[in-house]
Design a protein with these regions (language model features):
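Hydrophobic packing residues within well-ordered alpha-helices of enzyme cores
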Residues: 152-155, 181, 201, 265, ...
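Structural signal for hydrophobic packing residues in well-ordered secondary-structure cores
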Residues: 39-42, 46, 57, 80-87, ...
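Conserved C-terminal structural/oligomerization subdomain of aldehyde/semialdehyde dehydrogenase
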Residues: 2-3, 26-27, 321-460
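ALDH superfamily catalytic-core signature
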Residues: 3, 163, 196-331, 352-353, ...
Length: 460
């Protein structure tokens, strides 16, 4: 895959700036037409996209459709239904002191946007933000990950066939291309990736005070209380940890489990892995592989940080890693300080005052992107109230991202800003306050020398 030259990046950036300045993207009819074009493209290119996902990630058609294609299509359809209402000028209340004025809230597109996505959900995490950009009336440059070259190539061809470069374009390459992109002046940067790279993005954005949306990650805790339904918890956790082979930003990262139920949970977890993936998970076409050799070596390197109590099989040739439970893990080890991004699961056993110890543990670390609790719902709400995370679930994992009616985003080290549904439109928009004042009367109290100040003070 050929990297995009710096000269090409500058030319595309300048062309999109000029196109936005022309006002062509302001019309709601234009935006809806572009959303329809993107939806049509998703339908036409579905096979090429899902084939590429299989080649790059060993992601089955079913999983590719459920976790990538359908999410983007659903987002497009939502925006088609709602964008006219979101973009409509709204009247706001005007207090008597502003008489004879009318107050309005106006949505305007931020302008030219840069969208940088990772490799783990390379279709969804690139094109879902694009829906928000189109809906809000922005132009967009898309930068897919070089670690999924087949997917990135298909997306580039699809976008080139569907849109003019001056409106939406794809650039390809590694970090040198990211550097060239970040040297340009954008009106919004939408970045999905690691906190380390996000700091580079923020540093670049700060030069021009460019707003950013950062969708990051972190170590999302999975808490299993003694009141949990063990079989249901094991099934849902096993699904969440093996979905995309753990290469999900909101995958449960580590387990905090009540000592009384540890043995029962380990047994149930092993059983549910078999129910989901068969007797030999390596033969299951729905089980995704590590994205590359570097990721395989990094994740298998965590095995040395504790004692394996389930799983542990690997195959370097196919980058296969069996779901693996590990106990007796030092809290300062890489396994408990780095985002795992794989099917390895450290388990911390807690005895005594479970709720307070869990709260102390979670709040002593960076704020995670997700938080999962299994047990009595009221106890889950209490722990959620006293901790912080981007989002989460009680008695489930991952499913909060599936509801388009609630926003998705991080907090602190797990990100800033949010998107999905209206929040995607808002992410690429600026909210203006406009007052239109009549000229048929001009109340004198606001003007110097404030001769009626005494009366005005009483009114205010």
């Amino acid at each position: 895959m050929e990297s995009t030259s710096t000269e090409r990046i500058i030319a595309v950036h300048d062309a999109q700036k000029a196109f936005f300045k022309s006002g062509a993207t302001l019309d709601i009819k234009f935006r809806k037409e572009m959303l329809i074009k993107l939806l049509d493209a998703m339908n036409r290119w579905e096979k090429e996209l899902t084939d590429a996902l299989w080649t790059d990630l060993h992601k089955s058609y079913e999983e590719a459709y459920l976790t990538e294609i359908s999410i983007v299509k659903g987002e497009i359809k939502t925006h088609l239904r709602k964008v006219a209402g979101w973009a409509r000028r709204r009247k706001a209340h005007s207090p008597i002191k502003l008489f004879p004025s009318r107050s309005y809230i106006v949505k305007e597109p931020l302008g030219s946007s840069l969208i940088i996505s990772p490799w783990n959900y390379p279709v969804q995490l690139l094109l879902n933000p694009l829906v928000g950009a189109i809906s809000a009336g922005c132009t967009a440059v898309l930068k897919p990950s070089p670690y999924v070259p087949n997917v990135s190539e298909v997306i580039e061809k699809m976008i080139a066939e569907t849109f003019y470069v001056k409106y939406i374009a794809v650039v390809q390459g590694h970090r040198d291309v990211n550097t060239a992109l970040l040297e340009q002046r954008w009106d919004l940067i939408f970045f999905t990736g690691s906190p380390a790279l996000a700091k580079t993005v923020m540093t670049s954005a700060a030069r021009n005070l460019t707003p950013v949306v950062l969708e990051l990650g972190g170590k999302s805790p999975c808490i299993i209380d003694s009141t949990a339904d063990i079989k249901t918890a094991a099934k849902r956790i096993a699904w969440g940890k093996t979905l995309n082979s753990g290469q999900t930003c909101i995958a449960p990262d580590y387990i905090l489990i009540h000592k009384e139920i540890k043995g029962e949970f380990v047994k149930a977890f092993a059983e549910e892995i078999k129910n989901l993936h068969g007797e030999d998970i390596q033969a299951d076409r729905h089980y995704v592989r590590m994205v590359n050799d570097k990721a395989f070596e990094r994740v298998t390197g965590y095995f040395k940080d504790g004692d394996i109590i389930y799983g542990g099989r690997t195959d370097a040739a196919t980058r296969f890693i069996e779901p693996t439970l590990i106990e007796n893990v030092p809290l300062d080890s890489p396994l408990m300080t780095e985002e795992i991004f794989g099917p390895v699961f450290p388990m911390i056993t807690i005895d005594g005052d479970f709720k307070e110890k869990v709260i102390d543990f979670v709040t002593s670390r960076e704020k995670p992107l997700a938080f999962y609790y299994f047990g009595k719902e009221s106890d889950g709400w209490e722990i959620i109230r006293r901790t912080s995370s981007g989002g989460g679930c009680i008695n489930d994992v991952i499913m909060h991202i599936a509801n388009e009616n609630v926003p998705f985003g991080g907090v602190g080290n797990s990100g800033m800003g949010r998107y999905h549904d209206k929040d995607s439109f808002e992410a690429f928009s600026h909210t203006r306050s406009i007052i239109a004042t009549g000229t048929w009367i001009d109340l004198p109290f606001r003007y110097m020398p404030y001769e009626t100040f005494g009366l005005v003070k009483k009114i205010l």
